[in-house]
Regions:
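Glycine-centered hinge/linker elements that transmit conformational signals in sensory
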Residues: 174-175, 216-247
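N-terminal secretory signal peptides
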Residues: 1-11, 18-21, 25
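Extracytoplasmic "Venus flytrap"/periplasmic binding protein-like
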Residues: 54-124, 131, 156-165, 259-266, ...
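Short, solvent-exposed loop/beta-turn-alpha elements that line the ligand-binding surface or hinge
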Residues: 80, 110-123, 187, 191, ...
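A structural signal for short loop-to-beta-strand junctions that line the ligand-binding cleft
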Residues: 80, 85-88, 116-155, 185, ...
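Hinge/lid segment of periplasmic solute-binding proteins
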Residues: 94-146, 169-171, 197-200, 286-292, ...
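C-terminal lobe and pocket-closing loops
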Residues: 272-284, 298-403, 434
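Short, polar/charged alpha-helical segment
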Residues: 43-62, 404
């Protein structure tokens, strides 16, 4: 899922201080006997309810479950926090971590060693995505990464028996497909100003060996490896004409629809979309799409971007030691093992193709059977090992993203050079970081 817009740091901190003051009396009076409040957005609802029922039966601990649509979820939770609502555990997007942590709406879980023990068996980018200022704030709910998917039948018609391994080879194969009249625009990448745009951009940058922001939060997006990523994209549109200039109006869902209709040879899409592409009820080209390792740039690797959503704990959960331990049990039941098995992770994979952070699940017979029914479990695991968290997660992301997206689009349309576009983006990031 995409990164989400956030307010400025100043507004977050002001609201966080206010919410802490308002909620404090309620938190102090919370009792361990009260049901544990668990809030989510409206996804996997039936699966959550069934797993909660099993938890209550197993532990005797009562829970109170609520959910709201994703589009309103963040605002709904802020209202709950400022009103002192009895929420103990909730889903949080990796994009919101700085905001929620700085505001004091969620608490680190480092004290619960039974929870942090799962770090050793979890994908590195998932662990990194729950860390803020040296503290860990949760366990993985689900995760995924941007995959490089290709139509094997179209490649075969063009005379290719293997997919490209570099972005240069992507260009060459796409040009051959175009020359044979198989497709006008064999490459389909969404570069519309929508929430998925940062995932597409990050994937191209990481696979070229670049970054947008360094570990200190300073911009490096103006450097050569990042420029090489944008230059490849610009050349695909302007020079080789294998990617439509209409990509600036193409969102992630349109990429999926185009691929499903057989009008794409190479696409960037979230890995979980592979199941839909190979489902005869959803796709005209079922059985034709495969996943390959992300192509790499001249100075890059087969890297991609990953994202995750996690279970977090609130100050309300820590009102008493017993309540904290009970909330930790609930978090482990969902984000770790339940009765000795990763039951919830396997359920949402089977039912909804939602990915997992536990690396050992790629060796689970049931999981492998499911993944291999529409893809390649071993390749999926190898690619996940090379996924990196987004490096642009910051309270000012939303303000920067508009400028960055426009700059990349202007470069794609030939209005500015890649270097000029990245200089504009870098300057905006630096200005926002200084302003805080």
């Amino acid at each position: 899922m995409p990164i989400d817009r956030m307010p400025s740091r100043r507004s977050v901190l002001k609201l966080g201080a206010a919410s802490a003051a308002l909620a404090a009396p309620f938190i102090r009076t919370a009792r361990a006997a009260e049901p544990l409040g668990f809030a989510t957005w409206s996804a996997t609802v039936d699966q959550v309810k069934a797993h909660l029922a099993a938890f209550e039966k197993k532990t005797g601990i009562a829970t109170a479950y609520s959910n709201s649509p994703f589009a309103q979820y963040r605002e709904t939770m802020i209202t709950k926090f400022t009103g002192g609502a009895p929420v103990d555990m909730l889903w949080v997007s990796d994009a919101w971590l700085p905001e929620f942590a700085q505001a004091g709406w969620i608490e680190p879980i480092d004290r619960f060693k039974q929870l942090t023990a799962y770090d050793a068996v979890t994908s590195d980018f998932c662990n990194a995505s729950t860390m803020f200022e040296g503290k860990q704030y949760g366990l993985t709910y689900y995760t995924d990464y941007m995959g490089f998917l290709y139509n094997a039948e179209i490649l075969a018609k063009a005379g290719f028996t293997t997919p490209p391994t570099t972005w240069e080879e992507v260009t060459a194969q796409a040009a051959a497909i175009k020359a044979k009249g198989l497709l006008d625009y064999p490459v389909v990448i969404g570069m519309a100003q929508e929430s998925w745009m940062i995932e597409f951009i990050s994937t191209l940058v990481f696979s070229h060996g670049g970054r947008l922001v360094d570990d200190a939060g300073d911009t490096v997006m103006q450097e050569a490896k990042t420029e090489a990523a944008l230059q490849w994209l610009v050349d695909a549109v302007q020079k080789h004409k294998v990617l439509s200039p209409g990509c600036v109006q193409t969102g992630e869902l349109e990429v999926l629809k185009t691929a499903s209709a057989g009008r794409a040879a190479f696409v960037l899409l979230p890995k979980y979309r592979l199941r839909a592409l190979n489902d005869p009820q959803q796709s005209q080209v079922a059985g034709q799409f495969k996943q390959a390792m992300m192509p790499m740039g001249a100075n890059g690797a087969h890297a991609t971007v990953g994202w995750m959503r996690f279970y977090a704990m609130t100050p309300h959960a820590l009102a008493t030691a017993e309540r904290g331990e009970n909330t930790a049990k609930l978090m482990e039941w969902f984000g770790g093992k339940a009765d000795g098995d990763y039951r919830f992770q396997k359920t949402i994979l089977k039912d909804l193709a939602l990915g997992f952070g536990i690396k050992a699940l790629y060796d689970d017979p049931d999981v492998r059977r499911d993944l291999n029914s529409y893809g390649d479990a071993d390749l999926m695991a190898r690619q996940q090992d090379l996924a990196h968290k987004k490096d642009t997660i910051a309270p000012w992301f939303g303000e920067w993203s508009d400028t960055n997206g426009t700059a990349w689009q202007q470069a794609l349309l030939g209005k500015v050079t890649p270097a000029q576009a990245l200089k504009t983006s870098a300057a905006k990031w630096s200005d926002l970081k200084r302003a805080g």
